[in-house]
């Protein structure tokens, strides 16, 4: 007993040493091949293809003689296919160094070898598979070590020697192609699991493929098939039968993609059967069926009998004890169904075919699915039909990675002969078949692609309404505006009360055509979803061709919401309110309006909504403000006419003016600020500092007009550069504490400036924003305004102080406490307000990424002022 154990130990050491030696030599070859350029690689593989082509007949003969399976002539064709078709397909593939470069996108792809390949080959296609795997391995600069099927060791090794010698003669390293000289399951397992092997390329039975995937390393293992072929009633019968005979008799059915059962519509069943019989195909009689089953299937009837694989129909019939005419090409077994109860509906790898009658298309599809579920999932399914719509339905239904149409399955499945699929002798079955690949395996599967991605700045934009009219009495544009027949005016009650709505009516009355007008005047401050829905209903009833939003930000925002829902009733407020990082890539898109023109006429100088793609709407259920943002909400026309702002009360002018200042400053320091927006931001800031106080205390046409222009200019800037956390916080606490939006911004802004100017705990993420610069941006604003300061820090503080003083000068009490917020209210709401502010859309463009705890502190600081 001890001697036996010692002998086993010695044997294990010998096998291990053999595998270690193969792996070591292969890795040395890998190191040498890594230096090869594309030209040298292509020369080597071309010489391999030529050598294999030269020896395709002797190799085929050797395979048949050694295995006792298959057809000499067909194996010769397979060897030609493995050399000629494979070379033709891969010869122009870039597999070395830089294989692709996109200068515009800044992307470079570099190909590297995956490493040493373990190649496992079957007894069914020994020489052709060896040629194929050797060529795709060396095309990608990967040495390959083979574990051949023991019953085809000699012919497989000869095929490997032929291509190896050609490769070496062309400049490849000596050990670019190797193989296990003394095959065994133990040796194959050791090779697959060896640390010197990078990837396993396995073709064979289910057990071998499973072993390949159990190595803990990448594997390209492809398993067995059980291919159904459906001949539908519109099929060309002669062609379909011919295709099946071509496929099923090729190399005696040993290609795993060959058909295993033909499912035929009942309307043409007899005709198909007769066509088979006309071509020396024997239909097994009912009393012979059991004999055939006993001969073809193994003892348990769950798999093919290995001894009949690749043998001719005549040989199998003789083995089964069935008398058939001389020259019989195929045996067909008529079955009542598929599945375990019908063993001959399994994979048979021989010129034996099951044939089942289908009552209709659904029944046929069920039978095909049953075939695939019986050991063929993921492989191949075939349909013969002239109904192109049915081709697609078949493809959608079948869990097979190759759906072949009007094609012999064996030749069609391997690709390139009958179709445009990648030529291959290793056919992936995807997750259906427990494979990692679902396509035909080729050289592309044996390279690592490294991507060099150069930094890029996102393409930016400058989008505004197509038409912006300004100056006093620019309202007259409505007299000449085209395609105005039915107008709906959206406003708040004040616009009707103070006659502004009538002013618009009067201009529309100057038109040559009779304009029908409907007015929705129920917009409240901080418009709600309920208001938007009510206006949308009126809009749907009236069917306007033009919508005019008349009023402050509330009216314009509400009108945008109505416009959105009127144009596209299926729009989701839930979707529209969601945040985004890039407005062009947002998860929920609002469709562009198509039915109506949208005109905004601002009557306050604050929101800039007349030129922006934003609308702030309050959810009626949660009372939370949400800034909707989509360029579909950009108005078609903005009329910035100062005649509408001459009578705005001082307190409103102060609040809206500070909103303008916040828009301008936040858009200037935004991560998305650009050369196209900063000039607008700066000019708006200067106009506010020059004219707001006068506009509040001693208003005249000039000061009110300048503030009106500043509002629109700031809107133009933040429509494209966006805002920051001042608005994020203001959106939430303004609604919660009942403070006007502009006033809330005024109170927060000095604290935001000081916070943003400090070095960030978390830096902002945006490609164009090269580095943190909010402090210097604020300092630039201070310099532009002529504020005093020797250092950046002093200039930042000067700006924050100037904002604070401006707010005070226009009558704003610059603290939340002074606005009536109690300490108790603050304490019970501040945490939730900070979280909601972080969630706000405006947060994403802030010059530094805020922490929720920091937003909380800003609110606390603003409480005390």
What label would you give each PLM region?
Residues 94, 159, 530-643:
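Glycine/threonine-rich beta-strand-loop-alpha-helix active-site module
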Residues 459-546, 816:
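ATP/NTP phosphate-donor binding region
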Residues 736, 742-825, 865:
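Gly/Pro-rich interdomain helix-loop hinge
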Residues 2-11, 16-23, 42, 282-287, ...:
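C-terminal segments
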Residues 6, 13, 131, 209-339:
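ALDH superfamily catalytic-core signature
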Residues 270, 278, 611-721:
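Carboxylate- and glycine-rich phosphate/diphosphate-binding segment that chelates Mg2+/Mn2+
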Residues 98-239:
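Rossmann-like NAD(P) dinucleotide-binding subdomain of oxidoreductase/dehydrogenase enzymes
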Residues 2-108, 136, 278:
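N-terminal Rossmann-like NAD(P)+-binding subdomain of aldehyde/semialdehyde dehydrogenases
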